[in-house]
Regions:
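Structural motif
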Residues: 24-26, 51-52, 78-82, 98-101
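Glycine-rich, anion-gripping cofactor-binding loops and their flanking helix/strand elements
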Residues: 55-94
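Long hydrophobic segments that form regular secondary structure
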Residues: 13-54
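Single conserved hydrophobic/aromatic residue that forms the stacking wall/gate
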Residues: 1-7, 11-12
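Peripheral docking tails and interdomain loops at the edges
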Residues: 82-138
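Short, solvent-exposed amphipathic alpha-helical segments in soluble enzyme
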Residues: 8-9, 39-47, 70-71, 95-100
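Short beta-alpha connecting loops at secondary-structure transitions
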Residues: 23-25, 64-69, 107-118
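Active-site proximal loops enriched in glycine and acidic residues that flank catalytic Cys/His/Asp
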Residues: 29-32, 38, 53-60, 83-87, ...
Length: 138
């Protein structure tokens, strides 16, 4: 049975997917990029860099939340990063200190993992850039 969803019913509220003690950073993602965020979080944890991963499938719902809720999600750590297999434009408003990993150029045709890797969207490349950022700006 398929149900017809209307308007905001299609948007699901954000979820904390991975967290722990001594959080150094927050990683925001949605859809298929959440798995990439989790892989990145695991790679960073092996280097004693701990992160919180947030699945945010509907920014419109998040934006309507009260300040204390948004602060709980975004302000627990000093640094916030986002992963998006499209434009970073919608994520930039959440990042005061940190980076957006995204694909700003188009026209590459290949299996998605090769395209992601070409644009730097692999857990290996993202974790290295995050580690470099933290060393440089902390």
């Amino acid at each position: 049975i398929l149900y017809r969803l209307v308007g905001s019913e299609m948007c699901i509220r954000d979820r904390i997917i991975r967290t722990g003690k001594n959080i150094n950073l927050t990683i925001l993602a949605s859809g298929s990029e959440v798995n990439l965020a989790i892989e990145t979080s695991h790679k960073l944890a092996k280097q004693k860099i701990y992160s919180k991963v947030i699945s945010m499938p509907c920014q419109e719902i998040f934006d309507k939340q009260n300040k204390s809720y948004k602060d709980k999600i975004l302000k627990e750590s000093k640094n916030t990063f986002s992963i998006e297999a499209g434009s970073k434009m919608s994520w930039e408003k959440y990042i005061e200190k940190g980076l957006s990993f995204s694909i700003e150029d188009f026209g590459k045709s290949a299996p998605y993992k090769k395209v992601y890797d070409h644009f730097g969207l692999s857990s290996e490349k993202i974790s290295k850039k995050i580690k470099f950022y933290l060393k440089k700006w902390q």
